[in-house]
């Protein structure tokens, strides 16, 4: 009899989620194939911001030093009004680092993906120009059929293929075919588009600090600048008119003409007290206009298919949590599979075991956190764009009162509750808050070491066996003796006036007075 092939994961999408998952599976010793419809590390897109929990994951994977070498530290943050005047500022990223333990870093997305790819130990597992056409589940396996006719067989398919996921559509069809109505219209329309954005990078402009974040609020749009010594990342968030807002399956695509039209309306607007947007636009290195979807789906898995990253949750860029949340998904999927396979070292898990593990250990542990992150990001986008009078009051007047330190601490609080790989030991960096999973594990270990160890009985007859159980009633006997002694003492004092051994003269005088009063009454 031939041994069955090892458990294998087919990852669809070689973006942040897919490449992170590939590294996680390498650490777990789980086989995989990574497919992408295009090429790895494409030129579109501008930047990714790695929050402390993203850096912690990279630290576990052994990728952190290589990534940090490609970018510089972030410094302070300033919030500005439509005229570019500062109304609040602080050492934002220093506060985040102090509370969470790791830096926040911004770098070119293409550079980041290239580093993750180059650090993979076996690049032959990565397939470019591999467009998925169909997924077939049969006999406890899955077959991924590509548009060019190639097939890849495995035990689990992970759709990490972005907000317009092909794997998600296939999973929806399979779910509704097996259980009509399982995937509702409400869920399919859960991701909404109410904003678009110009995402671009420019060379440095005199007057803008090399390490800071600048947020300049306007009426229904905002400028977000993340600055590095050699370039500046710029995102212009714009609220769409009601008649242009949409949900799935509508996909807004913008042309160069669309982007130029928007730029013409904002080119003279201040981004700082000394720089207007046109100066950044003139120095642009690359730019594109995109839709900003936001939302969280309810079903993350069905059968032997699971969704991750933007395919299942999408957050606006203001909070810089989207890519980090996708990395969290990769970690939890890998943890789930590592634990599941450890239960069956000599055989593969069944369909039911795979399905239940992915639902209970992955989906059910992730969905609430994803919703909280998406809401936080959406609220911040609207607040910074003065989207309504409440948002204006919060950003312009309450933020200076509350202080950016509070926002930085909240970001750090989200970071330290993120997961890490359960099977990779490393010397993590800690901030004031500490990593919650690590603290919980330490507390559990301490509680185990404090458990009283039962006293081993000596061989032969012991006092407890010899006395016939007499020791079990010793406490009751002692209480009875103490009560009897007190009664005798009280009787003795009342009627004789003598002292009770161990008590001072004040007690004797008290009982003498009591005696005389009682006897002559």
Curated annotation (Swiss-Prot):
What residue intervals traverse the membrane? 477-497
Task: List the PANTHER family hit by this protein, alphabetically.
Answer: FAD-BINDING DOMAIN-CONTAINING PROTEIN-RELATED, FAD-DEPENDENT MONOOXYGENASE ASQG-RELATED
Enzyme superclass (EC): oxidoreductase
Report the locations given in the UniProt record.
Membrane
> Which pathway is recorded for this entry?
Polyketide biosynthesis
**GO MF terms, alphabetically ordered:** FAD binding; monooxygenase activity
Supply the InterPro entries for this chain. Answer: FAD-bd, FAD/NAD-bd_sf, FAD_mOase_fung
One Gene Ontology cellular component: membrane
Q: How does it sit in the membrane?
A: Single-pass type I membrane protein
The induction text for this entry reads: Expression correlates with the production of depudecin with high levels on oat grain medium, and minimal levels on oat flower medium and complete medium.
Q: Where is it mainly found?
A: membrane
**Which Enzyme Commission number(s) are on file for it?**
1.-.-.-
Q: What is this protein called?
A: FAD-dependent monooxygenase DEP2
Name the protein family. Belongs to the paxM FAD-dependent monooxygenase family.
| Binding-site list for FAD | 36, 109, 310, 323
Offer one Pfam family short name for this entry: FAD_binding_3
Q: Which cofactor does it need?
A: FAD
């Amino acid at each position: 009899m031939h041994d069955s092939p090892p458990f294998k994961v087919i990852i669809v999408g070689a973006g942040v989620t897919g490449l992170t998952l590939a590294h996680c599976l390498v650490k777990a010793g789980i086989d995989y194939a990574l497919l992408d419809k295009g090429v790895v590390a494409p030129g579109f897109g501008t930047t990714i911001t790695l929050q402390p929990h993203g850096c912690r994951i990279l630290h576990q994977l052994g990728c952190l030093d290589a990534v940090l070498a490609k970018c510089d530290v972030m410094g302070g943050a300033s919030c500005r009004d439509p005229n570019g005047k500062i109304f609040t500022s602080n050492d934002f990223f220093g506060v985040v680092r102090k509370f969470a333990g790791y830096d926040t870093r911004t770098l070119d997305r293409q550079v980041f993906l290239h580093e993750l790819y180059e650090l993979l130990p076996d690049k032959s597992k990565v397939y470019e120009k591999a467009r998925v056409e169909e997924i077939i589940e049969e006999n406890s396996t899955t077959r991924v059929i590509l548009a060019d006719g190639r097939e890849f067989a495995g035990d689990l398919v992970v759709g990490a293929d972005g907000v317009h996921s092909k794997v998600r559509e296939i999973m929806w069809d399979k779910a509704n075919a097996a259980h009509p109505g399982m995937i509702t219209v409400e869920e399919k329309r859960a991701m909404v588009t109410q904003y678009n954005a110009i995402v671009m990078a420019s060379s440095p402009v005199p007057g803008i600090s090399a390490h800071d974040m600048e947020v300049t609020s306007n009426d229904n749009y905002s400028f977000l600048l993340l600055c590095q010594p050699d370039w500046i990342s710029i995102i212009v968030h714009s609220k769409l008119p009601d008649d242009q807002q949409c949900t799935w399956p509508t996909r807004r695509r913008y042309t160069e003409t669309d982007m130029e039209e928007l730029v013409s309306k904002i080119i003279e607007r201040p981004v700082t007290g000394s720089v207007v947007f046109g100066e950044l636009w003139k120095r642009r290195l690359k730019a594109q206009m995109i839709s900003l979807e936001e939302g969280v789906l309810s079903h993350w898995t069905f059968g032997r298919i699971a969704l991750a990253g933007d395919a299942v949750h999408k957050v606006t860029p203001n909070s810089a949590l989207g890519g980090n949340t996708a990395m969290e998904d990769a970690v939890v999927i890998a943890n789930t599979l590592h634990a599941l396979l450890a239960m069956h070292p000599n055989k593969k898990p069944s369909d039911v075991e795979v399905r239940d593990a992915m639902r209970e250990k992955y989906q059910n542990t992730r969905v609430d956190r994803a919703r909280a992150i998406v809401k936080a990001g959406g609220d911040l986008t609207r607040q910074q764009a003065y989207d309504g009078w409440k948002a204006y009051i919060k950003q312009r007047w309450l933020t200076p009162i509350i202080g950016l330190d509070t926002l930085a601490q909240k970001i750090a609080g989200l970071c330290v509750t993120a997961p890490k790989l359960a099977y990779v030991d490393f010397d993590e960096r800690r901030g004031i808050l500490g990593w919650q999973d690590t603290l919980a594990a330490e507390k559990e270990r301490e509680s185990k070491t404090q458990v009283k160890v039962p006293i081993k009985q000596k061989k032969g007859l012991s006092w407890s066996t010899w006395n016939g159980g007499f020791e079990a009633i010793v406490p009751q006997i002692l209480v009875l003796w103490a009560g009897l002694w007190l009664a005798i003492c009280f009787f003795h004092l009342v009627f004789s006036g003598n002292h009770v051994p161990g008590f001072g003269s004040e007690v004797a005088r008290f009982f003498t007075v009591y005696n005389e009063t009682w006897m002559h009454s």
